[in-house]
Design a protein with these regions (language model features):
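Acidic-enriched, low-complexity/disordered segments with a strong bias for Aspartate over Glutamate
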Residues: 2, 15, 56, 64, ...
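A short secondary-structure junction motif
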Residues: 28-31, 110, 114-117, 151
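Acidic/histidine-rich alpha-helical segments that form the ligand environment
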Residues: 80-121, 131-137
Length: 160
């Protein structure tokens, strides 16, 4: 594996930073996940659901699979209009965490073989190297991880 690929993989799991993105889900109960402890905010369930949608879209791009970005935005926005309780009829919190972890692990595994300098033809902002999508993935996950931590602080379940 290329040294750059290794550094990107390490960044995904929190090497030399505070923690892995997966740490934020530890110990969260189903009821805590659907609660909105902060006025006018999303529940942790809704945030994780959003993270999965976009992580899967980012993975499609990394694998150079065709992506309809307008459709992806439409779906992501429609999903956010559902309430956490409506979403719960589809998946439990534990299933969501498993889905996120599976997709996250796939992104890490792809780093074993992928050329990060290879241009992505499916990227919406021009012909950028695959490395750019990994930066977007890490930034997106980090931002929303912070939102979940904020919810957990408000619930009194953070720090662990």
């Amino acid at each position: 594996m290329d040294a750059l690929n290794e550094v990107v993989k390490e960044s995904m799991v929190g090497d030399c930073t505070h923690m892995s993105v997966l740490e934020v889900f530890k110990g969260v109960t189903h009821n805590q996940a659907i609660e909105k402890p902060i006025a006018n905010s999303l529940s942790s369930y809704e945030i994780l659901h959003h993270m999965i949608i976009w992580q899967d879209i980012f993975l499609k791009n990394i694998k150079d699979e065709p992506t309809d970005w307008e459709e992806a935005n439409r779906i992501a926005n429609e999903e956010l209009t559902q309430t956490a309780k409506e979403m719960l009829s589809q998946k439990t919190w534990d299933q969501l965490v498993e889905d996120f972890t599976r997709s996250f692990d796939e992104a890490k595994t792809l780093l074993d073989t992928i050329d990060l300098s290879k241009p992505m033809e499916t990227f919406p902002y021009g012909n950028k190297p695959t490395l750019k999508m990994y930066f977007v993935l890490n930034q997106h996950n980090s931002y929303h991880m912070g939102q979940i931590i904020k919810n957990r602080v408000a619930q009194g379940t953070w720090p662990l």
